[in-house]
Design a protein with these regions (language model features):
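Membrane-embedded beta-strand positions in outer-membrane beta-barrel channels/transporters
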Residues: 47, 79-81, 108-110, 137-141, ...
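Transmembrane beta-strand segments that form the barrel wall of outer-membrane beta-barrel proteins
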Residues: 30-40, 58-70, 82, 88-102, ...
């Protein structure tokens, strides 16, 4: 989808930056902020997750992603979602969220199963998203951070989301991160794969990433 108003994109990016700073100053230690920046051969991208723990069972999350080409705005990707997550027994989490993504506003309800270990995180989700019609959405996150030395850890992170309706595969992506981590900073190789069955051709982006856990 082509973004016709460049000013809107600039304003959105500025707002995203301010939102991240604001949440840290207001919520304090009960809030985590994790920005991830990528410089690729086709485009540059920014993602952040802000999580604020309301109670032992309730968590409020804000996820923002944008991906912009260097020369044109033809294939800009944007995704903003606010989610309320409720912790259920036996590693299950119920989520309800709303936001905006190409090509417009949406709402989601989905169930996750989470496995968390010292150096491994696995999350599988399934639910439904409404955006000009209902789709079945499935997601997968795998993250492995083995200890390499006293100060360094390896980083392997794979995330994928797929949406299908009764007729076709409507939207999907796969993001790969492979690198090293020291304390709160991770960096390395990044690869993003995007599919838009209803509009654009499939997109690929290869480059470097930096991720910070605040």
């Amino acid at each position: 989808m082509k973004i016709n108003n460049h000013r809107q994109m600039v304003f959105a990016r500025f707002f995203i930056f301010l939102f991240g700073l604001f949440t840290l100053s207001v919520f304090g230690q009960s809030t985590t902020y994790t920005p991830d920046m990528m410089l690729g051969h086709r485009s540059y991208g920014y993602t952040h997750t802000v999580s604020h723990k309301l109670s032992d069972k309730l968590t409020l999350q804000n996820l923002v992603l944008f991906d912009a080409e260097y020369e044109e705005d033809t294939h800009n990707i944007f995704f903003i979602r606010n989610t309320l997550a409720y912790q259920l027994p036996k590693n299950f989490v119920l989520n309800a969220g709303f936001g905006v993504k190409n090509p417009g506003k949406f709402a989601s309800v989905y169930l996750q199963y989470q496995v968390k270990r010292k150096d491994f995180i696995g999350v599988y989700g399934i639910g439904t998203t409404y955006q000009k019609g209902f789709t079945l959405e499935q997601s997968l996150l795998l993250e492995y951070t083995p200890k390499l030395t006293q100060e360094w850890e390896g980083v392997f992170r794979f995330s994928a989301v797929g949406n299908v309706n009764r007729h076709e595969y409507t939207r999907g992506f796969q993001h790969l991160r492979l690198g090293v981590k020291r304390e709160k900073v991770a960096l390395g190789f990044a690869a993003n794969f995007e599919q838009f069955a209803m509009s654009w051709n499939h997109l690929e982006n290869y480059g470097l990433f930096v991720k910070i856990n605040v």
